[in-house]
Amino acid sequence: MAETLQKRHEQIMRKFDRAHSPQEAVREKCLEATRFARVPGGQWEGATAAGSELGKHFEKYPKFEINKISTELNRIISEYRHNRITVKFRPGDKTASEALANKLNGLFRADYEETDGGEACDNAFDDGSTGGFGCFRLTTNLVNALDPMDERQRICLEPIYDPARSVWFDPDAKKYDKSDAEWAFCMYSLSAEKYKAEYNKDPATLMSGIERSWDYDWYDVDVVYIAKYYEVKKESVDVVSFQNPLTSETVTYDSDQLELVEDELADIGFIEAARRTIKRRRVYVSVVDGEGFLEKAQRIPGEHIPLIPVYGKRWFIDDIERVEGHIAKAMDAQRLYNLQVSMLADSATQDTGSIPIVGKSQIKTLEKYWANRNKNRPAFLPLNEIVDKQGNIIAPPTPVGYTQPQPLNQAMAALLQQTGADIQEVTGSSQAMQPMPSNIAKETVNHLMHRSDMSSFIYLDNMAKSLKRAGEVWLSMAREVYGSDRQVRIVNADGTDDIALMSVVINDNQTGQVVAMNDLSSGRYDVTVDVGPSYTARRDATVSVLTNLLAGMLPQDPMRQVLQGIILDNMEGEGLDEFKEYNRKQLLTQGVVKPRNTEEEQMVAQMIQQAQQPNAELVAAQGVLMQGQAEVQKAKNEELAIQVKAFQAQTEARVAEAKMVQILASADSAKRAEIREALKMLHQFQKEQGDASRADAELILKATDTQHKQNRDAAKNHSI
């Protein structure tokens, strides 16, 4: 076993040499550029692109630094911090949830804010834009490390300092985000004392009795180098899909997850639909030094190496990855500018008079007075007389001659101006940042600002690629870290926060335990980035635009009140909280804005329910109206009854007439006249009865119509 670990360690050391050797010169240039821009005196270090070391050639000159490259570099960094790049998740297929995507957005913002996300990204962007290479990492920490029963974790974003010396990727990885890397190193150094205290090992043993097959020296006098070694392994995993025949819902689990949920899935109607063996990416991390393993390999959440590179400019030339920051091409011009300023300053500080020419005997023992004349500025300078061997004065102490003062080099001044222009041209120094006259057209100003933005676009675009990769790595880790049913804090885009659940749960019937069915396990979520002004800047711009729009609206415009509410909702100020809360309730009531949390959803539902319930006066008015309608219907029914009775009476009369006709036909002639007279009287009586019935029906209908009109007028008065 020991021999196997030793061979494994040797393989890891050789991998490090493979990553370090071709990149060593490139990373040294990154460090040199960073020191050149940030460390005092760094602009006199190193050599030019052609290999000349100016510091050695001009040791006796004063060395001034007029840092003309930092202004543009600071502008690029400030532009990034003003226009933050945000990560967004969105559903990638039909099984993904829009609501869960919004929760992921809020949870990522919460992890970014509560950990070192801001510092990690800012530090990586600074390193990338200055030296050419930056990096940050994602890791997991316990939510409550003091509670041994609390196993909850959260994803953290951590900065990596001095990444040009510490982060090394698989040289076979060619993609910008290193998503194709199979392994990587993240180094850090410890003092000998801390190394001994933390790992209970004597650093001296690292150099004794080791037959090394690698080149890098992991121990240097008082410093011990150790590294986290990340490696991606592709392991065979059985993936099982279950489907509900009734709902056609499908869920997928790895084979090692089935023990927890298999019986519950069967109880709720899921049956196994398909099974497949796939290669699953899993990441392992171990800690190594120059002798062996300090910590054995352990699996970490996610499927990707959690190291996120950030580049300034990047190329592959001669199969070597080459990077540089914004100032790399301006370093020679800056060195020349500093040299010219130093030479002019040296010339200006020298004695402008002629230098006396004297013999050695005239200056003997008096050198210090003459050497320090520009520094001490004495009232007079001593000089020895010329004497013979007997000590007699031959000549007075008079200089033999004088040197001619060197005139100011006009070409030097012109060259100094040209060098400054060269620095501005190479760095793309923004003229838009200089004061402008007030009479310049708005289109011209926008054109200058756009041209200025182009010089920093490549750095912001590369940072967007890096943050997109960070979102992919975070999502891969979140599927495991936030897989249990627990409340998590999410942060909305406007900075407000809420509590949300990332999963649903079912009960294990055998153990009684609650088993989480993670919503994140189903569906694909795409990661995008949004490059633009911060939420505060966009909100202020919205207020400005809407205020101008409001000024052009008529007072009676129905949209004016809505516009005023939106402006107030986007405003910030002291003492506006209660007023804004009232205003938002009004906007929610009108349906102008959507609820953004559970409390507002409940409030909107309550308002809708109240709107559906009529008030007492309306109910009373509706009751009167219904009563009137009932009376009208009653009158119609009575009219129909009268008509039916009249029809029945007429029918009976016709039957009686028919019977009379039959009797008349069978009677003799003497009685026929009497029968006819009786029929005539009967017909007259039926007619009078029918007329009386119709008159009674009309009176009833008129009375009913009058009562209905009175009830309707009463209902209108109630509603008013």
Swiss-Prot record:
Keywords: Capsid protein, Late protein, Viral capsid assembly, Viral genome ejection through host cell envelope, Viral genome packaging, Viral penetration into host cytoplasm, Viral release from host cell, Viral short tail ejection system, Virion, Virus entry into host cell. It is found in: Virion. It comes from the Viruses. GO terms for biological process: symbiont genome ejection through host cell envelope, short tail mechanism. Its main location: virion. It holds the Pfam family P22_portal. One of its GO terms (cellular component) is viral capsid. Belongs to the p22likevirus portal protein family. Homododecamer. Forms the portal vertex of the capsid. This portal plays critical roles in head assembly, genome packaging, neck/tail attachment, and genome ejection. Procapsid assembly may initiate with a nucleation complex composed of portal and scaffolding proteins. The portal protein multimerizes as a single ring-shaped homododecamer arranged around a central channel. This is Portal protein. It comes from Acyrthosiphon pisum secondary endosymbiont phage 1 (Bacteriophage APSE-1). The gene is 19.
